[in-house]
Amino acid sequence: MRHYEIVFMVHPDQSEQVPGMIERYSATITGAEGTIHRLEDWGRRQLAYPINKLHKAHYVLLNVEAPQEAIDELETNFRFNDAVIRSMVMRVKHAVTEASPMVKAKDERRERREDFANETSDDADAGDSEE
């Protein structure tokens, strides 16, 4: 079986349906004896340019190992699902299991925010004890 990287974008009004879509597409892959190496829900993000007069979309990334029939079925599902505004399936040489740069950047921002919150609360505590 070959390895694929799949990214699809969902209409922002349909964001609440994304977990169900992920579950359905994952079942398609695992039902065809495929494996999912990485699944990332990037959430709602700004588009680089408008697509169908939309400026935001909900992004999902999948790295899978699956037979061609499963990939063909996924692409057909993407094509006939009106909520999916764009999709891209790329073949890759090997399974990618590490976190994507998008998730790494998000984690770094979260850590910086938490560090800043801890510093400000420490400063506030130190200011209270000096009085």
UniProtKB/Swiss-Prot annotation:
Keywords: Ribonucleoprotein, Ribosomal protein, RNA-binding, rRNA-binding
SUPFAM superfamilies in UniProt: Ribosomal protein S6
Positions with biased composition (Acidic residues): 120-131
Stored CDD domains: bS6 (cd00473)
Gene3D superfamilies, per database record: 3.30.70.60
GO biological process, alphabetically ordered: translation
Extent of Basic and acidic residues compositional bias: 104-116
A molecular function GO annotation: small ribosomal subunit rRNA binding
Region annotation (Disordered) ranges: 100-131
Single GO cellular component term: cytosolic small ribosomal subunit
PROSITE patterns, per the entry: RIBOSOMAL_S6
Physiological role: Binds together with bS18 to 16S ribosomal RNA.
Similarity annotation: Belongs to the bacterial ribosomal protein bS6 family.
Name of the protein in its database record: Small ribosomal subunit protein bS6
